[in-house]
Amino acid sequence: NQKPQIPGLTPAEIVNAFANVEPYLNQNLTLREIAARCFNGDSKALDNRHELLLKLYGDKANTIPPRPLLLTAWAPPGFTKLLIVENQDSFLRLVEAPPEDYALLYSGGFRASATRLSSEHTRFAFLPGSDPERFKQRWLDEQAECHFWGDLDFAGMGILKALRNSLPNLQAWQPGYQPMLEILNTRGGHAPQQTRKTAQTDPGTTGCPYTDTTLLPALRQTNTALDQEAIHIPPPNAGITNP
């Protein structure tokens, strides 16, 4: 087996650091807290090394609690639907002028963490005006209507696909994606090379009909993409005047 290499540490120092892990295994510390204590303050030294810890310490390594997933939410009293938003600026704009009946959740592009959504270790930070108890009761309800809105690119579609593992009813939010699609179809998008998106991979199918039949074909045909900050969602009653 290939020996672990950590820049700045000699092989002997690496062995010593791993040997120092054991006393911390039953102290309810996260992997990054343990790493910072054993590897000269480097909290990421043990990232992606859980299998090695299992070989060294067996089931003791399984006592390390998962790192909590911290999410920001705005959940007005009486909401009935959930909208997950990929990017911070767009999330905060929607909080200022929220779509009717929706709670909003800022995902922060957590593609790699999507499978942890339903974990007991997930934590929420609620913006003022929220009803935290109602949100916690309803947000993973498989009967509740839920949507995702993010960048119109393969990575964004991949996030939607991953989120559907925890939220099977999740659909792309058409009020957000439709105006983006119109821009994309009129050559208003950017090339993947412009924003270093060439490494993004096509997710294939997501299980969301609108995504699979409309959004993904447009991305493939135009070979361009559009970040969600490019558009502004008008307030629910914009343009409506009282008689």
Report the location of each language-model feature:
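G-domain G4 guanine-recognition motif of GTPases
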Residues: 151
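Terminal peptide-recognition signature
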Residues: 148
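Nucleic-acid enzyme cleavage-core boundary/entry regions
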Residues: 1-145, 154-243
